[in-house]
Amino acid sequence: MNNQYIRREVFCCGTCHELKSFWEKEISKQTFYRELEEDRQERSALKKLREEWRQRLERRLRMLDNPVEKEKPAHTAD
């Protein structure tokens, strides 16, 4: 289990300053973990793959909406 999810128990802090510094440290740890996770997600190939597939789907939909006709109707003399 990740340390960031472990519940922290504060049993005895003699002063408000100790309590405040404890929570400031906890907040800075959480911020650090969050930034690491954001960096990991930015480096992930998943975002790039999703964008590539989105572009492919858009091209496919455009092609289906506006098909290129291979056969042109023959001119008939009336």
Curated annotation (Swiss-Prot):
InterPro entries the record matches: FAM240 (IPR040261)
Q: What's the superkingdom here?
A: Eukaryota
Which family is this protein grouped under?
Belongs to the FAM240 family.
Protein name as catalogued: Protein FAM240B
Species source reads: Homo sapiens (Human)
